Curated annotation (Swiss-Prot):
Involved in unsaturated fatty acids biosynthesis. Catalyzes the dehydration of short chain beta-hydroxyacyl-ACPs and long chain saturated and unsaturated beta-hydroxyacyl-ACPs. One of its GO terms (molecular function) is (3R)-hydroxyacyl-[acyl-carrier-protein] dehydratase activity. The lineage of its organism: Bacteria, Pseudomonadati, Pseudomonadota, Alphaproteobacteria, Rickettsiales. NCBIfam families: fabZ (TIGR01750), PRK00006.1 (NF000582). It is found in: Cytoplasm. It comes from the Bacteria. CDD domains: FabZ. One of its GO terms (biological process) is fatty acid biosynthetic process. The gene is fabZ. The active site is at residue 49. This is 3-hydroxyacyl-[acyl-carrier-protein] dehydratase FabZ. One of its GO terms (cellular component) is cytoplasm. Keywords: Cytoplasm, Lipid A biosynthesis, Lipid biosynthesis, Lipid metabolism, Lyase.
Length: 145
């Protein structure tokens, strides 16, 4: 099931310049999701990170992983219109390859555990078949107040 940017914006609240998932390529409800982020030089982080050699910040790669996981949660629950997804913890984040404008980040997130409103994930980012980043993280789903 491919999910385009319009549906992504219906599923998660993030918007430019902080929407970091361009398309979902594959989803297996309650299990895993694959998506992409096309990295372009026009993104605001590259004006300062770094002007002479733009490099995608590692923290934004982790954020892209978390946003993709939030899409998986929304689709698995049927809707998150009355809910909010909050990142609680990031564990074992590792960055193995520079990501720069012109690259396509292939993001994969897998649910490791889900108990009540707490979800644990493992996620990776690859570029041109090479591991660029990996992380484990925990998110909490809460009712909107």
């Amino acid at each position: 099931m491919i999910i385009d940017i319009t549906e992504i914006m219906d599923l998660i609240p993030h918007r430019y310049p902080f929407l970091l998932v361009d398309r979902v390529l594959e989803i297996d409800l309650n299990k895993s999701i694959k998506g992409i982020k096309n990295v372009t030089v026009n993104e605001p982080q590259f004006t300062g990170h770094f002007p002479a050699r733009p490099v995608m910040p590692g923290v934004l790669m982790v954020e892209a992983m978390a946003q993709l996981a939030a899409i998986l949660v929304a689709k698995s629950l049927g809707s998150t219109k009355n809910k909010e997804v909050f990142l609680m913890a990031i564990e074992n984040a590792k960055f193995r390859r520079i990501v720069q404008p012109g690259d396509t980040m292939y993001i994969h997130a897998t649910i490791d555990q889900q108990r009540a409103n707490v979800w644990k994930f493992s996620s990776t980012v690859t570029v041109e078949g090479e591991m660029a980043a990996e992380s484990k993280f925990t998110a909490m789903i809460k009712d909107k107040s």
